[in-house]
Amino acid sequence: MKDLTMLLHELKDMSFFNKGDICLIGCSTSEVIGEKIGTVGSMEVAETIFNALDVVSKETGVTFAFQGCEHINRAITIEKSQFNPLTMEEVSVVPDVHAGGSLATYAFQHMKDPIVVEHITVPCGIDIGQTLIGMHIKHVCVPVRTSVKQVGQAIVTIATSRPKKIGGERAKYQ
C-alpha cells in the first residue's frame, strides 16, 4: 500500500513516533477497500498494515496498540509488557473479524503476548477509516496534518496530544 508507506514515512520525518510511547491504531479494513465500516473486513489488508507498523516499531521504538470495533466496546489489544494494572483493566475477549475487526484480530494473533484492555490513554494515534480513536487519546487531543489523506479508500485522521492549559487568565504557559 503506497499511501500507507507514504503516511508512515511522513510521520517518521516529523518525529510523530517516540521511543517508549504507545501509539493507538484504529482501522476499518472495510473502509480501506472501499466498503462501509464493519461490513466486509480483510485479513490481507490487516496483515499489510500490521507488518508496516511492525517495521516502524522496530525503527523508532514506538509500540502500537490496536483498537477493536464497537462490538467489543472499542477495547484495545496490547502487548502484555505494556499493561499497567494501575491505569488499565484487562477484559476477557478475543478480537474476531466480526467482533473486534480484522486488524485487532490480526494483531492479537501475531503479537508476542497479547492481552485486551477496556481503555487506554495514549499520547497519539492513527485512525484509518473513521473508527473514533479519540476516546483513547490523552487530553488535549491535537490534529496532525499530513499530505496523505487516505489509506486505500479510508479517510485518515491523525492525532497527538498536549498538556492541558489550566489556571485562568493569570496563568503563564511555556
From Swiss-Prot:
Alphabetical list of Pfam families matching this protein: DUF436
Protein origin, superkingdom: Bacteria
Gene3D superfamilies for the chain: Hypothetical protein TT1679
Coiled-coil segments on the chain, per record: none
Name of protein: UPF0340 protein SAR2202
Organism: Staphylococcus aureus (strain MRSA252)
Family membership: Belongs to the UPF0340 family.
